[in-house]
UniProtKB/Swiss-Prot annotation:
Protein's name according to its UniProt entry: Stem-specific protein TSJT1
Gene responsible for this protein: TSJT1
Upper taxonomic lineage: Eukaryota, Viridiplantae, Streptophyta, Embryophyta, Tracheophyta
InterPro entries reported for this sequence: DUF3700, Ntn_hydrolases_N, TSJT1-like
Source domain of life: Eukaryota
Tissue note: Stem-specific (active at lower levels in other organs).
Species whose genome carries this gene: Nicotiana tabacum (Common tobacco)
Amino acid sequence: MLAVFEQSIGRPPPELSLPQAGIQKKEAKTREEIAESFKTWKQDSTFYHLFNGNFMAFSHGNENPLQPRSIVVMDDVFCIFSGALDNTFDLRKHYGLSRQATEAMIMVEAYKVLRDRAPYPPDQVIKELEGKFAFILFDSKASTLFLAR
């Protein structure tokens, strides 16, 4: 999974940084260079180009059958999901989704419900999830990026 937005990279706390002794810093790659590197590395990748040169990409290469990857776009909300939820039945029932709804669809619906209909922050979605997963969710209307692992 890969998502590139805007021109900045988050800085980790100093406690999580690697020692820089003797390491020369390389100049940061552009979004286009990152996309080309990913395409070269994962030739079967699928790209979703968003506004302002931003993009999301994923590949099924080397996919673990127990942790499948999927992507869905619903109502201008893009979601790349990797892994599996252990409580999909309960979540589908809670959000009124069909049995065919994938984990990515569940994530988008859960995000939209909390965003639109409840006075809760979107990170409340995480509390309901059980399983081993990671996702990148981008709401293009609200320009909101939400990810979890």
